[in-house]
Amino acid sequence: MSSVFGKPRAGSGPHSVPLEVNLAILGRRGAGKSALTVKFLTKRFISEYDPNLEDTYSSEETVDHQPVHLRVMDTADLDTPRNCERYLNWAHAFLVVYSVDSRASFEGSSSYLELLALHAKETQRGYPALLLGNKLDMAQYRQVTKAEGAALAGRFGCLFFEVSACLDFEHVQHVFHEAVREVRRELDKSPLARPLFISEEKTLSHQTPLTARHGLASCTFNTLSTASLKEMPTVAQAKLVTVKSSRAQSKRKAPTLTLLKGFKIF
């Protein structure tokens, strides 16, 4: 599929070496980004969470019989894109999420896709993007039709899916794995430089805001807030690893799955 986002940034290597993929989850507050992340990583559904926390998780996956080291950044932009460079300079691919029962979240997803398109144009690098309509279990309250979602995805040349983080692990897993496949497809065409890895100990130098140069005022680049990278525990291990971003201090709890990134998991 032709995309306005171009090609990903990643190193090449033997197929025996796990492909490293950084995936950023973008969207407005309440779209279900955290629920999708935890569903994919633990097969569990969360009912409560702190929307102000931003974490990056690491998981070893097998996609099409090939090993993948997948890092997932669960962003916390609230209602508008903010401090965008923390994920624009980090991710190989983006999952843009909206809730099918929220017109506002759908409109917000359009802003993220525009931001990604501008960034790809300026850097002349590629970022596979997938548009995801979440909360399909709330379809009786739907404010955004499937046709509208497909049309928006078509406008930016990205893949489109509708899922429910509440009900459906297999389809959620398929979306994350499809993001990996998109990165592979682009790397097969033209492998480029490795991505920028970030930690809380280091921040990026300030640059002229991308959106200021293009009139997209919603994204601001204040003091960069970057998330720590943590290995995601398996459900069987039931070991909690909770890391808050620079908005809060890091925490480690006793072995349990009661809380994960401020979530209650059922």
Swiss-Prot record:
Keyword check for Hydrolase: yes
Q: Which family does it belong to?
A: Belongs to the small GTPase superfamily. Ras family.
Gene name, per UniProt, is Rasl12
PROSITE patterns referenced in this protein's UniProt entry, alphabetically: RAS
Write the record's keywords in alphabetical order, separated by commas: GTP-binding, Hydrolase, Nucleotide-binding
Recorded superkingdom: Eukaryota
Matches recorded under InterPro entries: P-loop_NTPase, Ras-related_GTPase, Small_GTP-bd, Small_GTPase
* Keyword Nucleotide-binding recorded: yes
From the Swiss-Prot or TrEMBL record, give the protein name.
Ras-like protein family member 12
What catalytic reaction does the record list? GTP + H2O = GDP + phosphate + H(+)
**Which species is listed as the source?**
Mus musculus (Mouse)
